[in-house]
């Protein structure tokens, strides 16, 4: 099979970076004071203050990979926050559609103590992701967050 013109190429593990998005405007008034706060630690690493706790950053690349994260690995591509840039990147790589998952907040909400705050943050992140995907809803397919504190 030499001709791939009729093959649909899907990135099934795409990521957006909602970590720098100000979610307060997407949260009900009574919860806005509990929105995540971004800050840097004494080594200049990005951290997040949420529920009165400082959430630590990863120090490695994952199981089976040794060594600290490099600045390049710690960063993010512009297309993770700007859907127009992502679509250009997808065109350059020949990707027809991307299934998109959140990162920083998405990996945090289910560790929160408050099931109500978790639900509010899930809704805020889902609203942001929906806006992101509106740039091309046939190609950008967001995976919503669901709070798991209250089965």
Describe the function of each predicted region.
Residues 1-151:
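Helix-coil boundary/capping segments in enzymes
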């Amino acid at each position: 099979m030499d001709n791939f013109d009729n093959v649909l190429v899907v990135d099934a593990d795409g990521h957006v970076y909602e970590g720098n998005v100000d979610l307060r405007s997407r949260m009900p008034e009574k919860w806005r004071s509990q929105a995540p706060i971004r800050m840097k630690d004494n080594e200049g690493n990005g951290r997040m203050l949420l529920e009165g706790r400082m959430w630590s950053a990863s120090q490695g690349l994952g199981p089976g990979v040794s060594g600290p994260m490099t600045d390049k690995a710690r960063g993010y591509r512009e297309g993770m926050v700007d859907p127009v840039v992502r679509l250009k990147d997808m065109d350059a790589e020949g990707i027809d559609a991307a299934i998109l998952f959140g990162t920083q907040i998405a990996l945090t909400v289910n560790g929160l103590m408050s099931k109500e705050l978790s639900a509010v943050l899930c809704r805020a992140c889902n609203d942001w992701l929906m806006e992101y995907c509106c740039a091309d809803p046939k190609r950008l397919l967001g995976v919503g967050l669901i709070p798991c504190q209250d089965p």
